[in-house]
C-alpha cells in the first residue's frame, strides 16, 4: 500500500489546520490515503519547510 503523494498545497493546509489545533485524524480523514507520519513530517519541517500555512482552510474541511 502506498501513501498519498504529499503536495505543497496540502502542506500549507496541514500547517494551518494544526495551528488551529485540528487533530491529525481529521487531517488524514480529509486527505484519504495520507498517514499521520506525513502530517508529522510537515509539522517537524522535514517536508515543505519553506511553505507557509494556508490563509484559510478549504470550505469542505472538517471543523468542530
Short names for language-model regions:
Residues 49-64:
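Short Lys/Arg-enriched helix C-cap and helix-to-coil transition segments
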Residues 4-22:
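Short, amphipathic alpha-helical "recognition" segments used to contact nucleic acids or chromatin
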Residues 29-42:
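Short, basic interhelical loop/turn and adjoining N-cap
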Residues 2-4, 27-29:
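Short acidic, glycine/serine/threonine-rich helix-capping segments at coil-helix boundaries
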Residues 23-24, 35:
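Residues that mark the N-terminal boundary/hinge immediately upstream of a DNA-recognition element
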Residues 1-3, 41, 62:
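Basic, low-complexity segments
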Residues 17-20, 33, 45:
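Residues within well-ordered alpha-helical secondary structure of globular protein domains
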Residues 42-49:
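Catalytic-site neighborhood detector that most strongly recognizes the C-terminal catalytic loop/helix
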Amino acid at each position: 500500500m502506498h501513501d498519498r503523494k504529499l503536495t505543497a498545497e496540502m502542506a500549507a493546509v496541514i500547517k494551518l489546520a494544526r495551528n488551529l489545533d485540528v487533530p491529525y485524524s481529521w487531517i488524514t480523514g480529509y486527505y484519504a490515503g495520507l498517514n499521520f507520519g506525513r502530517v508529522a513530517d510537515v509539522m517537524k519541517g522535514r517536508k515543505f519547510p519553506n511553505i507557509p500555512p494556508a490563509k484559510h482552510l478549504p470550505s469542505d474541511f472538517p471543523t468542530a
